[in-house]
Amino acid sequence: MSFYFKNIKPDLHSGNEDEEDDIASIIRINDTSDAEGSQSEDELKTLSFGSLKKADEMMDNEEQTSRKSKSKANGEKKHLNKPKSRELTEKQRKLDDGQRRQSGLQEEEAQQKSQSIKMFAEESFGEESDSDSDGGFFDEESNDEANQNGKKKKGKRKHAPTESSSKKKVRSMRKIPGLEDNKSKSIYQDVRFDKAMGKSEDLAKIRQRYKFLDEYREKEINELDSMLHDRKFLSKISDREKSEMEQQVRRMKSRLETVQVMEMEQKIVKDYEAEINKNNKNKYHLKDSEKRKVIQKWKFEHMKGKQREKVMDRKRKKRLGKEFKQFEFHKR
């Protein structure tokens, strides 16, 4: 026996046998692969070019159909996803708006709280605190402001009261409409035109009460006239001042004359009505036109000779002018 068989032991496999088995399996695999390759080559040799071309066309058609089906499926998915995406974006926007509003309200509440704290701090720790009476004057306003800040802030209404800033200092005295005293206006008022003393329409009574003022006016007019006739005084003043004084004298004289004439006319009408209504139970009052005629008659009777002649000349000229206008050569 050879050396190889002598060294074999029962129930034990040597390492050389394992190696040989592996080599044999590898050789078998290679043989099978070679056989398959030879068979495929033989089959390709038997195929014609026309059949190969048809097979290529079939493969291309299948690929195109598969691509189209995939593109359609993707398009439908996109169309389905678009409205969902829009809905999601709208929801996100709404949520963002709600969060912003909540944050804005929280900030406003925080600002109001800080302002109220500052107000209380300024009132309690100010350098110059107002007196107790002044503080009581504003108790109601401070309570109202605290209640308003405690509630949730709503939108400003049309007829809401005006809001003043907390940075401005509060005045010790509040301005009340109707009780404002304007310093520009004079405090002293004329009693004649005060409603508390009676109706201002009753001019006759006012004239009777203050008739003594005419004497003072006459004295002032006489003094100004004497000053204007004084040469020494005129040499000291300018021409402008002289003209102003002359205008003032004329103005005062015209006012005094108008007041005196009105008083005289009222007296004439009153006396005439008293004579008419002596024996009448029902009093008769004259019209304005009748009053004018009565006044003119009285004035004409109490005029001097020269004044009457002047009045008659004026009336004669008026009458002639009216008659002259009525001629035919004026009616063209």
UniProtKB/Swiss-Prot annotation:
Per the record, where are the segments of Basic and acidic residues compositional bias? 73-100, 321-332
Subcellular location per UniProt equals: Nucleus, Nucleolus
**Protein's job:** Component of the 90S pre-ribosome involved in the maturation of rRNAs. Required for early cleavages of the pre-RNAs in the 40S ribosomal subunit maturation pathway.
Species whose genome carries this gene? Kluyveromyces lactis (strain ATCC 8585 / CBS 2359 / DSM 70799 / NBRC 1267 / NRRL Y-1140 / WM37)
Family membership noted in the UniProt record: Belongs to the RRP36 family.
- May I have one GO cellular component term? 90S preribosome
Basic residues bias spans: 150-159
InterPro entries cross-referenced by the UniProt entry = RRP36
* Compositional bias ranges of the Acidic residues kind: 124-144
Q: Where is the stretch described as Disordered?
A: 1-184, 305-332
The coiled-coil segments of this chain are: 236-283
Keyword Cell membrane in the entry? The reply is: no
What is the recorded name of this protein? rRNA biogenesis protein RRP36
- Record's keyword terms, sorted: Coiled coil, Nucleus, Ribonucleoprotein, Ribosome biogenesis, rRNA processing
Recorded hits in Pfam families, A to Z, give: RRP36 (PF06102)
Keyword Ribonucleoprotein in annotation: yes
A Gene Ontology biological process term: maturation of SSU-rRNA from tricistronic rRNA transcript (SSU-rRNA, 5.8S rRNA, LSU-rRNA)
Q: How does it assemble?
A: Associates with 90S and pre-40S pre-ribosomal particles.
